[in-house]
A protein has these predicted regions:
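Acidic catalytic/metal-coordinating carboxylates
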Residues: 35-38, 61-64
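Conserved sequence signature across two-component system core domains
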Residues: 8-9, 33, 51
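Active-site beta3 strand of CheY-like receiver
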Residues: 46-52
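C-terminal output helix
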Residues: 88, 106-115
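The feature encodes the CheY-like receiver
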Residues: 58, 86
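Two-component/phosphorelay signaling modules centered on CheY-like receiver
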Residues: 12-31
Length: 120
């Protein structure tokens, strides 16, 4: 059975790119969210094996969404994907409960390596 994924990013292009990388590697995309609030709501409904989460999104940012998900589901597996590769944000995302971090633009191989570490 394929591992399931929820993709959270406000940019359609990034959601489409991640979906292509992940479905090509045998993952099933259960849903997509454009805001942090949608991400939390969809996580509750879908409970995927993995979440990819952008940091900067309208409404509720990715780090706050990670905190909200981890508060309810401490074992959630979340991979941050953001253009903002600043050290402080990486540390904050990991402290919030994210398991790994990839910086955009990324190579498909780097995304898949991070996914394997997060699911490992």
């Amino acid at each position: 059975m394929a591992k399931t994924v929820l993709i959270c990013d406000d940019a359609l292009f990034m959601r489409t790119m991640l979906a292509g990388i992940l479905t090509g590697a045998g993952f099933e995309i259960l849903g997509e969210a454009q805001t942090g609030t949608e991400a939390v709501k969809q996580y509750r409904e879908l409970q995927p094996d993995l979440v990819t989460m952008d940091i900067v999104m309208p409404d509720m940012g990715g780090i706050d969404a990670v905190r909200a998900i981890i508060k309810e589901y401490p074992h959630a597996r979340i991979l941050m994907c953001s253009a903002m590769g600043q050290q402080a944000l990486v540390i904050e995302a990991i402290q919030a409960g994210a398991r790994d971090f990839v910086v955009k633009p990324f190579q498909p191989s780097r995304v898949l390596e991070a996914v394997q570490r997060v699911l490992g």
